[in-house]
């Protein structure tokens, strides 16, 4: 009887370890989602929404979401919280299926296939403010960069960003990786 008890206890521990191990392995990044957990595919119209920072412009984000056709919105950032989720999902008056904020704070996380898939499945992408140097150093030449370019060039969904998120959306960008520059310096030698 004692042998049977230990066998059952061992199986229970093994089952717990497997379940816990799979749970821990299931998501190795931070994200928050509001709205439907079911992915939808909607008809979208491409567009770029560039905002300089500070207070978000409701009309600009509404314009972006109207182009998303009621689909899923992904918000990318390298630090912070889910501050955009409720605002974008329920305070703008433009229905979307869901809003998910994903924190990508390392190059390793920018290589997670599940994150790239979530980005590729989005009908709108918004890149929050922060530090554009971290966006460049974490995302450049990774599946996240490929997924963002796929949304813009192939799927043609609306993409927007504010502050640092705006700064990295062009073909040429100011990364602020090595130092900063004043307006007077930049205007005196814009091609340096």
Indicate residue ranges for each PLM-predicted region.
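Bacterial Sec-dependent N-terminal signal peptides
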Residues: 1-28
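Surface-exposed charge patches in extracellular/virion surface proteins
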Residues: 2, 120, 155-156
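Generic detector of bulky aromatic hydrophobic side chains
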Residues: 6, 26, 74-76, 101-103, ...
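Intrinsically disordered, low-complexity coil segments
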Residues: 12, 93, 153-156
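Polar helix-capping/helix-linker motif
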Residues: 7-8, 111-112, 141-142
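Class I SAM-dependent methyltransferase SAM-binding "motif I" and its flanking Rossmann-like core
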Residues: 45, 136-192
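Extended, subdomain-level signal for the structured scaffold at the beginning of enzyme domains
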Residues: 27-134
């Amino acid at each position: 009887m004692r042998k049977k008890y230990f066998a059952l206890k061992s199986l229970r521990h093994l089952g717990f370890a497997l379940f816990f191990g799979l749970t821990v392995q299931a998501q190795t990044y931070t994200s928050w989602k509001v709205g439907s957990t079911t992915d939808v595919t909607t008809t979208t119209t491409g567009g770029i929404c560039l905002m300089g920072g500070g207070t978000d412009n409701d009309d600009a984000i509404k314009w972006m979401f109207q182009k998303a056709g009621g689909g899923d919105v992904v918000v990318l950032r390298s630090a912070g919280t889910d501050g955009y989720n409720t605002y974008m999902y329920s305070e703008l008056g433009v229905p979307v299926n869901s809003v998910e904020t994903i924190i990508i704070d390392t190059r390793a996380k920018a290589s997670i296939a599940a994150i790239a898939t979530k980005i590729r499945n989005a009908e709108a992408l918004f890149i929050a403010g922060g530090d554009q140097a971290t966006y460049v150093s974490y995302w450049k030449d990774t599946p996240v960069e490929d997924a963002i370019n796929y949304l813009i060039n192939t799927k043609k969904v609306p993409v927007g960003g504010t502050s640092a998120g705006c700064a990295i959306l062009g073909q040429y960008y100011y990364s602020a990786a090595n130092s900063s520059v004043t307006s007077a310096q930049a205007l005196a030698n814009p091609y340096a």
